[in-house]
Amino acid sequence: PDFQLGPFQDPRHALAAWFSSPDNPFFATALVNRMWAHFLGRGLVDPIDDSRSTNPATNPELMAYLSDRFIQSGFNVKQLIRDICSTHAYQLQSQTTPLNATDHATFARFYPRRLSAEVLLDGISQVLDVPTVFPGGPGKFPAGTRAIELPDENVAVHFLDVFGRPGRNKACECERVSEATL
């Protein structure tokens, strides 16, 4: 986009305004694709960072519908989550049938996947009613701090490393390790 900036205007403000403008279709489709991938394990465009015209969505009508709804809602993420979770694809069971046993491209069923290391640790802590104590003491991480809230991988927690927490230098969630390394 061509920004008309005044002499003392910060170009970052103009860029941020353009990013979240309804006139910018890329922001909505990128966020819809990431949220879809978060809930269903794979984006409508896969890989999620490859949104070239030569790599179309598996369901372009659904992508357009969700993107339009997201823009019309004023970029309301809660509404986007409701829209994704109310789709037929999200509500499918994981049990295979002869028709969908080998289908991995069309969201014909739910594909079970492992919990992330942070979610697993938080779940165990909640079920056992024993809060996890993180290095640095209560001054740095007060009681009740969840693993999902940790700021970076510099907080040394062996459990998280063993169960696949990626380093922050990894740009893609696909770098998350899915096999336990016990």
Where are the language model's segments positioned?
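Primarily short, surface-exposed interaction patches in extracytoplasmic proteins
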Residues: 1-144, 149, 157-161, 166-176
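Catalytic cores of secreted/periplasmic lytic hydrolases that degrade extracellular macromolecules
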Residues: 153
